[in-house]
Amino acid sequence: MIFAPGKAILRIWLVIMEVIFKIIRQQENSAAVVQTYPLQVEPGNTILDCLNRIKWEQDGTLAFRKNCRNTICGSCSMQINGLSALACKENVGSQLARLQHIQSPKTQNKTIHEITIAPLGNMPVIKDLVVDMSIFWNNLEAVAPYVSTAARQVPEKEFLQTPQERSLLDQTGNCIMCGACYSECNAREVNSDFVGPHALAKAYRMVADSRDSNTENRLENYNEGTKGVWGCTRCFYCDSVCPMEVAPLEQITKIKQEILARKQASDSRSIRHRKVLIELVKAGGWIDERQFGIQIVGNYFRDLQGLLSLAPLGLRMLVRGKFPLYFEPSEGTQQVRSLIESVQKAES
């Protein structure tokens, strides 16, 4: 079919293909099974379109969440070919192209097209593609994601913000709470205390909000143990799957910067790790491993228990000739130092 409005020519090629949808189905507290559904589709069909057709035409028992169908509500988030995404945003053509790109040469030429769909990770399954998001919402609540005016006088009409102040909130304000970042989070997988990237992205929104009066208490909370920002493993998965480009890791990093600007190295091991790393690299161009562990874990010889915990590792390194007995600065130490000092000056 060809349309020719003016000089522009738009060609629309109608392609029908058969795709096998492999859906991971599961009842609550039972083992998962894979069920396949063949479907005649077009490349432009969204995954949600296909799921609707499967439910309406083949299997009415299939359970999944949906609502807006337009990348607004976040309800239809699920794992599609191994990555968490919105079913209403992803289409058949792009998913098959991504699969072809990552497949081995042996499997690229097969004519059977398959798309695998599974429920979100890091949350228990209720049925099929529907997960229990209670812990997701509880972790969001843990960061108090709302403006606090407890220490301020509430104006008669409203809190006014400049366009510049409001612009700081735009990126995090785009979050639709779809759970894709939470599903992919490596830290959540191994650390049940970690509140998750969605919560910390919202947390930064509160830190950056000029109307909020609770910044110091918030930063104390987000700095605590590994449940807050120091629990992040910086795997970048949250940024890579976010459909709204909220960049949760970037927001977590901003909170860390706020904490590091206010805290001393002696306040906690997490803070000490960052500050000591920078100072050692600035001094020698790279890390002096003889000092790194002692300064961080041993807190500059103030933490006897921490120092004793290093002893077994130190002895094994000595026995195997792996302990660095001396340190030699790198050849580019001066350039590295100048770069770090330039960045520190720009940030101050």
Predicted regions and their residues:
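Short strand-turn-strand beta-turns centered on an Asx-Gly dipeptide
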Residues: 24, 80-83
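Short, Lys/Arg-enriched N-terminal segments with co-localized hydrophobic residues
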Residues: 2-16
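Short, contiguous acidic and Ser/Thr-rich linear segments
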Residues: 35-46
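Short, basic, low-complexity termini and linkers enriched in Ser/Thr/Gly/Pro
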Residues: 94, 100-111
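Eukaryote-biased recognition of intrinsically disordered, low-complexity regulatory segments
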Residues: 17-36
